[in-house]
């Protein structure tokens, strides 16, 4: 649990530790109260002594309550700090992984951060702070009588053995169950994401059957782990009760032999119950402890932190592009998808990428934007490797229209502005450049129409034009359009051609992935890809 003493959390954890110290000191009072009542009050029959002891004990318990609240708030503040520090980079890494490798499990890192925060709000972390007090409690019991201390120590060792067994029996299965649960969740998300195809093709039954098999396997794993945890938890409860009975029995023998007072017998039993309670809680919540530890381990894995961008701020690009012997493939053990591709474009030039499906056009388009990292070779924008650019600074100078258009849960204007501050003039200028202004005005609320999952349903042509406007927002210097003529009718295709001419007039470097000869005729150069190699390149 080294993450608990990470520098951002250290002051909160230190405060929680101090509060735990004072809390456990306060919780010694009930045992001392019992001892004094049996040994002093009963012997002296003094009401004043009883009243004073009761008042002191109530005061100690009130103080303990305050310290428990302080500890809870300190741990909650630690969780808040953890979420603030780790959630944004975890989400950024999820976005980069999804864009760079096409994987959607990067969001699991965000869930891992939430798992740590949940642990800091649970009972398991409190038990961690209380468990170190076990030796001190055992020492106090031993001071009451050595045999009571020995009996209590043996009982604590038995509970510690159960805790070790819980670690060994549940650690690997807990990690596997977490991964399985997330896989089941991703499977369900994929079904919902492609619902139209499943329903349209009558695949709902088969899709549900496949998901049900995966879900059933997860339920079986969960049941086995839950059964093991329940048995260990029940064993810990019975062991604690047994240890308390043993201490009570040994205390009774000592009382009968006149080696201890009844007050010592009862006080030792109460104190032992308090000492063993956090150990029992740790065993009962061992899964939460392992979940938190696994979450931190995954967050510390290589590649879990966002790739650092260049610290030196480069000047705004003018759009000069150079692709030098680029080789790319997802799996080093399989043939590369792109093999030694090279070409250059001066600022303001345009290039059309054509080729059969699977030839590598879309992969190359993503490489040009820095969404993929080549195995060898380089993609240079204004002589700087695309990886050297700060993504946040470079983004406004790039325009991208992917094959699969997606909009955020925001207005049309906010989507075109890329979720940044909406400059009305810039948004309208981008829409006009994409020939989408009139299309947007015909929507129910115009530029204020909501898009995304909770927004209006758009036709394919409407989506394509608004997405093109988003790509052109801010007068980008490098524009990559992946099959921008998809879903467009004759009017939309004419608008796209006009947009390409305006981009050329504005000095933007444009790369278009497409098939139609009419669209390619608007460009300066055509490159033909086949099986990942550049077969030919020349004037359009």
PLM features per residue range, with description:
Residues 1-29, 43, 47-53, 71, ...:
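Membrane-integrated ABC transporters
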Residues 7-11, 99, 111-120, 124, ...:
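An intracellular "coupling" helix at the cytosolic face of ABC transporter transmembrane type-1 domains
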């Amino acid at each position: 649990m080294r993450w608990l003493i990470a520098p951002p959390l250290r002051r909160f954890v230190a405060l929680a530790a101090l509060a735990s110290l004072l809390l456990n000191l306060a919780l010694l009072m009930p045992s001392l109260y019992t001892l004094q009542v049996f040994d002093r009050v009963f012997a002296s029959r003094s009401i004043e002594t009883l009243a004073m002891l009761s008042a002191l004990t109530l005061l100690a318990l009130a103080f303990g309550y305050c310290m428990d609240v302080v500890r809870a708030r300190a741990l909650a503040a630690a969780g808040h700090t953890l979420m603030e520090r780790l959630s944004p980079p975890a989400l950024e890494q999820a976005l980069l992984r999804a864009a760079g490798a096409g994987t959607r499990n990067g969001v699991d890192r965000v869930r891992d951060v939430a798992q740590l925060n949940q642990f800091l709000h649970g009972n398991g972390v409190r038990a961690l702070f209380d468990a170190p007090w076990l030796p001190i409690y055992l020492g106090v019991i031993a001071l009451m009588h050595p045999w009571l201390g020995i009996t209590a120590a043996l009982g604590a060792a038995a509970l510690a053995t159960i805790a070790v067994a819980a670690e060994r029996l549940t650690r690997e299965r807990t990690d596997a169950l977490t991964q399985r649960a997330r896989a089941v969740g991703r499977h369900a998300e994929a079904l919902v994401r492609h619902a139209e195809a499943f329903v349209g093709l009558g695949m709902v039954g088969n899709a549900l059957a496949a998901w049900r098999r995966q879900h059933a396997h997860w339920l079986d794993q969960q049941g086995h782990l839950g059964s093991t945890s329940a048995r260990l938890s029940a064993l810990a409860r019975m062991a604690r009760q047994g240890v308390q009975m043993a201490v009570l029995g040994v205390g009774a023998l000592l009382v009968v032999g006149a080696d201890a007072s009844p007050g010592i017998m009862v006080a030792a039993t109460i104190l032992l119950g308090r000492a063993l309670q956090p150990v029992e809680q740790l065993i009962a919540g061992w899964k939460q402890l392992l979940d938190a530890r696994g979450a931190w381990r995954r967050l510390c894995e290589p590649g879990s932190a966002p790739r650092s961008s260049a610290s030196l701020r480069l000047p705004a690009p003018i759009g000069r592009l150079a692709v030098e012997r680029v080789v790319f493939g997802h799996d080093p053990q399989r043939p590369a998808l792109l093999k030694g591709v090279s070409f250059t474009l001066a600022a303001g030039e345009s290039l059309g990428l054509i080729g059969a499906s699977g030839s590598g056009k879309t992969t190359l388009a993503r490489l040009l934007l820095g969404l993929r990292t080549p195995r060898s070779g380089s993609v240079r924008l204004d002589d700087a490797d695309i990886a050297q650019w700060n993504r946040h600074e470079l983004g406004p100078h790039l325009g991208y229209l992917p094959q699969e258009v997606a909009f955020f849960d925001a207005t049309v204007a906010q989507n075109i502005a890329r979720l940044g501050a909406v400059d009305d003039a810039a948004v309208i200028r981008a829409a006009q450049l994409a020939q989408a202004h009139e299309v947007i005005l015909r929507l129910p609320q115009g530029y204020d129409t909501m898009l995304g999952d909770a927004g209006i349903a758009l036709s394919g042509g409407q989506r394509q034009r608004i997405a093109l406007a988003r790509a052109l927002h801010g007068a980008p210097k490098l524009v990559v359009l992946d099959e921008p003529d998809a879903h467009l009718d004759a009017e939309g295709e004419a608008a796209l051609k006009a947009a390409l001419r305006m981009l050329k007039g504005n000095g933007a470097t444009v790369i278009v992935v497409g098939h139609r000869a009419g669209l390619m005729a608007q460009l300066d150069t055509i490159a033909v890809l086949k099986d990942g190699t550049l077969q030919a390149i020349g004037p359009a």
